[in-house]
A protein has these predicted regions:
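Low-complexity, Pro/Ser/Thr- and charge-rich linker/hinge segments at domain boundaries
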Residues: 193-197, 326-347, 408-450
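Short, hydrophobic/aromatic-enriched beta-strand segments in well-ordered soluble domains
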Residues: 155-157, 168-172, 306-319, 402, ...
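Bacterial N-terminal signal peptides
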Residues: 15-28
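Terminal, non-catalytic domain-edge segments
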Residues: 33, 322-345, 350, 643-647, ...
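Catalytic cores of extracellular degradative/oxidative enzymes
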Residues: 423-734, 739
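Beta-strand-rich N-terminal accessory domains
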Residues: 32-267, 272, 291, 301, ...
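Extended acidic/polar, glycine-enriched regions
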Residues: 358-424
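Short, hydrophobic/aromatic beta-strand segments
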Residues: 174-184, 323-325, 362-365, 884-888
Length: 930
């Protein structure tokens, strides 16, 4: 649930009392009782010095002379970009502010029980310079570390083989063995957007994402606009990327100084925080992170008296996001490429391609037997190929060892077959989360309500009232996912319950059915109004004194536009189901549902106008609605809807970065901005949007980060564990996958887009546990590493999946034929593939730019024979309420030399779809080449 940082003009505010609370909260929610700001420290008194080396051609490094930490790190190709927060150097010059070049340690001498922490950032003193000439800067860090530290630390900046090198030499200076249970290298880059306007942030700031892959790990630092060179941080020698520890902002309440291992830079919606590259982490795994399954097993190293070890990182740049992997290869780093990614349904073959200068010695699965592995040999002499199959549900990892001893780890998530996972989710929604109490004073029944998986109970009260109030992303999430599930994978009992929810709750309570605010959508059905309830009605264990505990007036407000797409999506889903099946939808005709979706969309513009200037979460549903209005011949309504959307798109066209929201920076509006700027032909703005998405939606060998659009504050608004934290596969994953895959269908030679988009489209399935509970998101911090117990705002994530899931066939010159979302067979130059995504109603053949979709019916498999210019569709047998298939054929691109395929002339057309009678067994249909 995002909230806008800037004050809203009074005339446009949602509701007076709420707007005041809203503005106050965003400015101070993360800082209530915040300590004073630290004044600048003396670390800059001696000025700065540049590292000068002719062989360092890609980066310009400037160091603070007294600390030899980074003052600025800029790519030579675009020197106006600083990867580090050099613009804040003065304000971050006091003790406890971290800078690139610092070091964190957790140590324990032999015979001692407790670990002790040390940091070069906590109390700064000028380091003892050992070398400060041209291309090499070395310093003894003893002056900036406590006197009782049992090791000496020497830091060196240098250039090695054209790469910038940062190394730390650690020597045990005592007569006892020293256990190093925590060794963290702080990664401080310019992701601090505090106080910046949106355009300024896009011009100056960067995001960074980790591949926590042991010796093969790396960090990529990407400019917010997605353009320009990408900074890559990789291990030097044996400096494995074992864990990723957040640097929090806990401070001394009196002085404002950061506590040990903390940085006082305020974390919030405009600053996610910095992180430590953890080389060793056993000291944390035994204490702060005890009992948590990490990305990799925690380790320590024991340094004997007089013994020394060296750890380090190297820095170089890739010319662009899409060239990250080729740049890693050029710098002799291991590269992994997974198809369809790193989320493996148990009925789907996965493929892993490895590329490195050294041969693979072994590939093993942890836990043993979690993934079966078949060695397929080499592709194009470059990639070592493997076929994978998930055997056990849950988290797993592959550990690859190369002939030189390099170890690479890849995190996988094994899930049930997609169709089963989604069916389990639906069953859980309409049984465990089904709330049916006719005496509920808030008119929330019958319906699907939020759920707490930790207690095993429905969330009928929460002081963030929207969670229990069926509105906002965190309250509508469950019923929204349960609704859109039905148009792709309907269940008769669930559809009946959904219709009862629409008639009994949505229309007339959550949404006004008459009066001045007809079609307006309330902010919450649940509210905190103790004078209107029996004594002790509200749970006394909850804090009802926050702004989040809206009274009935605030909860009834209809001015938040972001609540409207949820309702539109529910109506539209029932329209699609009623239109394309027989007897499943019984309460209203399809025309009623389509009109409800249309009127609700217009009401968003008239009753909640302010935030419609921004892209809406799930806004893609408006584009689908427009297409359906046209298909049904409702030209007047279609013209009106298009006019309203053009007004919004014209505004976005005029803005440099049209991604405003309720927050100063967000990753949710881009989905709809891309849709409409593409639809109206504003390609330059669509490209700006796409590049911005690629900046925060990485392709990384990890089920958690691959295609996981950056989100880090919504646990505050929708989670049970409320904290600022990088959320993995929150709803940004599913929603941002929509433009990524749409763009891929327009440019089917760009495999990077498919990999990024498909990682995002499969992400929402990982949130579904074995019994069907769907969590808001995964907690990435190493003290938790688990899905949140609340369903929260999962719904928009599943909307992204439902509107976007498909099976993709493509061909790569090096990797050969690839299938995302199905199993592929190749024989005599022809290929066939099964469709194994849950809906099985969309197929894309990339070599042809051919997009095949079914409004009714399901694909079971597709045969494609390039030599004989043939496509054969295998359609699943008749199902409950579905006796005909309704096929749409679209060429979204024209790849060089591609044939165009069309339907036989004899096929009947209805509302733009080809109608094919289904048989009791499989139906086969052939497309014709021309």
């Amino acid at each position: 649930m995002p909230y806008h940082h800037e004050a809203v003009p009074t005339s446009a505010r949602c509701v007076g009392s709420f707007a005041v609370a809203l503005t106050f909260f965003v400015a101070s929610a993360f800082a209530q009782g915040r300590p004073p700001q630290l004044p600048p420290g003396p670390m800059l008194d001696e000025g700065t010095v540049a590292l000068e080396a002719s062989e360092l051609k890609e980066l310009n490094l400037t160091l603070v002379r007294s600390s030899q930490t980074v003052a600025s790190l800029k790519p030579t190709a675009t020197p106006d970009i600083d990867y580090t927060p050099g613009d804040r150097l003065k304000e971050r010059s006091a003790d406890s502010f971290y800078h690139l070049g610092d070091l964190d340690l957790r140590l324990r001498s032999e015979g001692e029980k407790d670990w002790k922490d040390f940091s070069t950032a906590h109390e700064r003193h000028p380091v003892r310079v050992l070398s400060a000439e041209g291309g090499k800067f070395s310093a003894d860090l003893a002056p900036t570390l406590p006197a009782d530290i049992p090791i000496n630390v020497t830091r060196t900046w240098s250039v090695q083989n054209g790469e910038l090198s940062l190394s730390f030499l650690l020597m045990n200076r005592t007569n006892k063995a020293v256990h190093i249970g925590g060794l963290g290298i702080p990664l401080v880059f310019n992701n601090i957007m505090n106080g910046k306007k949106l355009d300024q942030a896009y011009a100056e700031c960067s995001f960074y994402d980790p591949y926590i892959g042991e010796d093969a790990g790396y960090v990529q630092v990407v400019h917010l606009n997605g353009l320009g060179p990408v900074l890559l941080v990789v291990p030097e020698d044996h400096t494995p990327f074992e864990a990723y520890k957040p640097i929090l902002d806990r401070r001394d309440r009196t002085t404002g100084k950061g506590l040990l291992l903390n940085d006082p830079t305020p974390r919030g919606t405009t600053f996610e925080g910095s992180y430590d590259w953890m080389v060793h982490s056993l000291g944390f795994a035994e204490t702060d992170w005890k009992g948590v399954e990490e990305w990799n097993p925690a380790t320590e190293v024991v340094l004997q008296p007089g013994e020394s070890l060296t750890y380090g990182l190297r820095f170089f740049v890739a010319p662009s996001i899409r060239q990250i992997e080729s740049t890693l290869t050029a710098h002799h780093r291991p590269v992994a490429l997974g198809v369809p990614g790193y989320i493996l349904p148990t009925d789907m073959q996965g493929h892993l391609f490895l590329r490195y200068d050294r041969a693979v010695r072994s590939v093993i699965s942890e836990p043993t037997g979690a993934i079966s592995i078949r060695d397929d040999g080499h592709r194009a002499g470059l990639w070592h190929a493997y076929t994978l199959r998930a055997e056990k549900w849950g988290r797993s990892r592959l550990v690859i060892t190369y002939s030189d001893g390099t170890v690479q780890s890849i995190g996988y998530r094994n899930i049930k077959p997609e169709i089963q996972a989604v069916a389990d989710m639906g069953h859980f929604f309409y049984h465990e989360q089904w709330f049916d109490d006719p005496d509920d004073p808030f008119h929330r029944t019958p319906g699907v309500i939020s759920y707490d998986n930790e207690t095993g109970k429905q969330v009928r009260q929460d002081s963030r009232v929207w969670i229990a109030g069926l509105s906002d992303e965190a309250g509508a999430g469950s019923w929204l996912a349960g609704a859109v599930k039905q148009f792709g994978e309907p269940d008769r009992e669930e559809v009946a319950k959904l219709e009862s929810f629409v008639d009994g709750v949505l229309w007339g309570h959550l949404q006004d059915s008459s009066g001045d605010h007809k079609y307006g959508v309330h902010k919450s059905l649940f509210y905190y109004q103790p004078d209107a309830m029996p004594t002790n009605y509200y749970d006394s264990n909850l804090n009802w004194k926050s702004w989040t505990s809206w009274n009935i007036k605030a909860a009834s407000d209809v001015g938040r536009s972001y609540n409207y797409p949820h309702v539109v999506a529910a109506y539209w889903s029932l329209y699609r189901l009623a239109r394309n099946s027989q007897g499943l939808v019984t309460k209203h005709a399809w025309q009623w549902y389509l009109n409800q979706a249309y009127e609700t969309t217009l009401a968003m513009r008239t009753q909640a106008p302010y935030y419609t200037r921004f892209g809406q979460m799930e806004g893609t549903v408006f584009l689908h609605l427009l297409e359906d209005l046209k298909n049904e011949g409702m030209t007047e309504q279609a013209a009106k809807l298009e006019e309203e959307m053009r007004i919004r798109a014209d505004r976005w066209k005029s803005e440099a970065y049209p991604f405003g929201s309720e927050m100063p920076w967000d990753s949710t509006g881009q989905e709809e901005v891309y849709d409409w700027t593409t639809y109206f032909g504003y390609k330059d703005k669509a490209d700006v949007t796409l590049n911005a998405i690629l900046a925060y939606d990485p392709v990384i060998p990890s089920w958690g980060y691959n295609g996981s659009a950056r989100r880090y504050w919504d646990f505050i608004y929708g989670g049970k564990i409320q904290r600022l934290e990088r959320q993995l596969h929150h709803y940004g994953s599913g929603l941002n996958a929509i433009p990524l895959l749409a763009e891929y269908r327009a440019h089917p030679m760009d495999l990077y887009l498919l990999r990024a988009g498909y990682g995002g489209v499969m992400g929402p399935l990982t949130n579904i546990d074995e019994k069907g509970f769907a969590s808001a998101a995964f907690h990435s911090f190493p003290d938790r590493m688990a899905f949140d117990p609340y369903t929260g705002d999962y719904g928009p994530n599943f909307v992204g999946y439902a509107l976007n899931t498909a099976t993709y066939l493509t061909h790569d010159d090096q990797l050969g034929w690839l299938c995302f979302g199905g199993n592929l067979k190749e024989e005599h130059g022809a290929v066939s593939f099964t469709t194994l995504d849950s809906f099985r109603n969309r197929v894309f053949l990339a070599p042809l730019g051919l997009w095949l979709t079914l409004d009714a019916g399901h694909f079971s498999s597709v045969d494609y024979d390039p030599r004989h210019k043939a496509i054969r569709l295998h359609l699943a047998p008749q199902a409950d309420g579905v006796t005909v298939a309704r096929l749409r054929i679209e060429h979204t691109a024209n790849p060089p030399g591609a044939l165009r395929f069309e339907a036989p002339a004899a096929w009947r057309i209805d509302a733009g779809a080809y109608v094919l009678p289904l048989q009791a067994n499989e139906t086969v249909a052939n497309l014709q080449a021309r």
